[in-house]
Amino acid sequence: MSRIGKQKISVPQNVKLIKSEENNFIVVEGPKGKLEKKFSMKIKVRIENGEILVERVDDSKEARALHGLSRTLINNMIIGVTEGFSKVLEIKGVGYRAAKSGNKLILNLGFAVPVEMFDTDKIKIAVDGDKIIVSGIDKEAVGQYAANIRAKKPPEPYKGKGIRYLGEKVRRKVGKTGKK
């Protein structure tokens, strides 16, 4: 039995949960928005007296793998519609800047042309000095968008210039020693 999968999920009062039996489709609605996800038929979700219990239909390898994952995904949906998720990135480097213009994030990263990224309906972007704050209700979408921003200019190991997550430690390398 999965240690994570067998834990119950408590549903807050302000969250509405709708479950479809025939195709294992779950809709979670809360104060921040609405999320929906389809789960495997090898997983059974039960809702009883304000708690969600995730069980597997059989003991196959696939069902065991999906058990803990499904429970965590449902928990993340509930946290997302009540509190939301956010990731903070910081820009290091001379002349590296980020600006927000409408629904567009403009990154000046030392390339010939500024890099432009567009907001989606699930994601909100805020720029505060050298920090970029990515927030939204879908944890997967927030993490992916933040990873896409970081991929535009990952931190390099010699000077540490680039885009990194807040608090991320960049392993530094020693440069050339030169001729003696």
Residue ranges and their predicted role:
Residues 2-67, 71-146, 151, 156-180:
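N-terminal intrinsically disordered, cationic/polar leader segments
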